[in-house]
A protein has these predicted regions:
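Hydrophobic transmembrane alpha-helices and their immediate loop junctions
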Residues: 1-172
Length: 172
């Protein structure tokens, strides 16, 4: 029985570690751009446990379905477009670096999946945030209609990419 649980537990633990790597990438980039962060959490919902290190609260939450870094949104919005892109891409960069370093291992593959998955322009994901920063920079202002068009077309494009990837893996 325990032998059957070990691979499942390994994937769960390595996925959690890859999510932490992702958020640490955002944290390092935010620190580099002087954007304050108040919380790094693994999971969502009520807090199970946590600790404070410096100004940041590190929390484990009850629903382990993701992770997040709580940044000062006002401070981030005041940064230049390249700085905002660096903060939004920080997690992806860390995941891809770890994927290369851990090439051929389950941890490497999980980091690759999380990094590439976050590049997709789904609403509120890193790829979407980068697209909005680039669009605002090109338009030189916020445009609600343009952001809605980008959001819907980004989600549609992401679904096409995911469908193509699943189809490709099915053919292999």
């Amino acid at each position: 029985m325990l032998q059957q649980l070990i691979p499942i537990l390994s994937v769960i633990i390595f996925t959690a570690l890859a999510m932490i790597v992702h958020e640490l990438g955002h944290l390092v980039a935010a620190r580099r751009c002087n954007v304050p962060a108040s919380e790094l959490a693994l999971g969502f919902g009520p807090k199970l446990c946590g600790f404070r290190w410096g100004t940041i609260l590190f929390n484990l939450r009850i629903l382990p379905l993701g992770s997040f870094l709580r940044l000062d949104g006002t401070a981030l919005a005041e940064r230049t477009a390249p700085q905002q892109l660096l903060v939004h891409l920080g997690g992806i960069i860390f995941n891809l670096l770890v994927a290369v370093a851990a090439y051929g291992t389950i941890f490497g593959w999980l980091n690759l999946l999380i990094g590439l998955g976050n590049l997709l322009p789904f609403y509120k994901h890193d790829g979407w945030k980068c697209g909005v920063v680039i669009m605002r920079s090109l338009l030189r202002k916020k445009s609600q209609p343009a952001e809605w068009v980008f959001t819907f077309s980004g989600c549609f494009a992401s679904l096409i990419i995911i469908n193509a990837a699943l189809h490709w893996f099915h053919l292999k």
